[in-house]
Amino acid sequence: MTEIGTVIDGKYEILREIGRGGMSIVYLAMDTHLNKQWAVKEIRKKGNGKNDEVVVNSLLAEANMMKKLDHPALPRIVDIIDNGITIYVVMDYIEGESLDKVLNEYGAQPEEQVIAWAEQLCEALEYLHSQKPPIIYRDMKPANVMLKPEGNIKIIDFGIAREYKEQKLSDTTVLGTKGYAPPEQYSGQTDARSDIFALGMTMHHLLTGIDPRSGEAYAPVRMWNPQLSEGIELIINKCVEPAAENRYQSCSDLLYDLEHPELITKDYKKKQKRKMRSFITTVALAIVFL
């Protein structure tokens, strides 16, 4: 553990601890050169556990993966310092509170607000999925989404994100968060559609206040709140289809429906069918009178 007041690399002064995991501690630090606050993740290279090397390598992989990314909804990594014993990862300090804390404090959130958050998350996930190779986040849930004071959001905790490798048939046997992770995440290959499933469960949780980890059987959102729109219910139901081929196939497709939920309701589909019947009748009559 780094003592408060320690200056790392001649410029990052440790102010206070703001979080910790199994082999890492996160501090708030002040860059004395730029007069700017950063979050500094301290990673000890050796501990007492037999899986320490695996954990350290995972944390380093997370840092190196994030360092090459640049998106407003993702935290930036600006420096990685290795003194031989400890690795320090310097990243954006994100003010605000996680969406799970918002749920705990205020309960289920308004549909309009949840859609706005989901649109931002779709854009961030689409950015990750568009990398070469694609990056699969694999742990979307309210606890991993920070709501900033100005209302925008950032995705945090890339500890189990990975670069997609098509030839690797199994990669996620014990990773992910139960209730949010799709079936394939526990038995085989994950891809962009796995993140879409977790985003659907995240939207469901935000709209209903029902934590999917509680063991409650899945029920469409309007069974919990009939005031929600049919459009958002259909969108979420499609996101969380057990079979990946039945879900949205990309976040861009999902984003389009989130921006136009009225287009997928039953009323819209009925109107389209009526238009098609009318068109077919018109064409048939035209042929008759030729």
Regions found by a protein language model. Give the residues of each.
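Activation segment signature within eukaryotic-like protein kinase domains
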Residues: 117-118
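AlphaC helix of the eukaryotic protein kinase fold
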Residues: 47-68
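Conserved short submotifs of the Hanks-type protein kinase catalytic core
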Residues: 84-98
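Conserved N-lobe ATP-binding subsite of Hanks-type protein kinase domains
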Residues: 25
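Protein kinase catalytic-loop region centered on the HRD/HxD motif
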Residues: 123-135
